[in-house]
Amino acid sequence: MKQTQLRDYTIKPGQLEAFVRVWKNGVRPIREKRGFVIEGAWTIPTEERFVWVVSYDKPDGFEAAVKAYMESPERKALDPDPTSFIVTQRVVFIDPV
């Protein structure tokens, strides 16, 4: 069953562009290589926020796929670590209507 997450990050002041580069060149391709589909990504520059929607539709399930992604050598090798840019995050599963 396809599961979709909305991920909303507040980024450290002045670091939004740097985070976007790390996300585009590191996070996104690694996620896609592991079977995730990036439905879209947006910035809200006036609020230093990055919002994206990611889905996964394979038998092992979203949570197992996230665990495998986080433990992957590619993710561990990301430098700078994308989480170092994030001040707060809101991550929720969303359903289509």
Which residues does each PLM region occupy?
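Active-site acidic-Proline motif in GNAT/NAT acetyltransferases
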Residues: 13
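Active-site-flanking beta-strand signature of metal-NTP-handling nucleotidyl enzymes
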Residues: 4-8
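An amphipathic, aromatic/His-enriched active-site/gating alpha helix that lines ligand/cofactor pockets
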Residues: 18-39, 43, 55-93
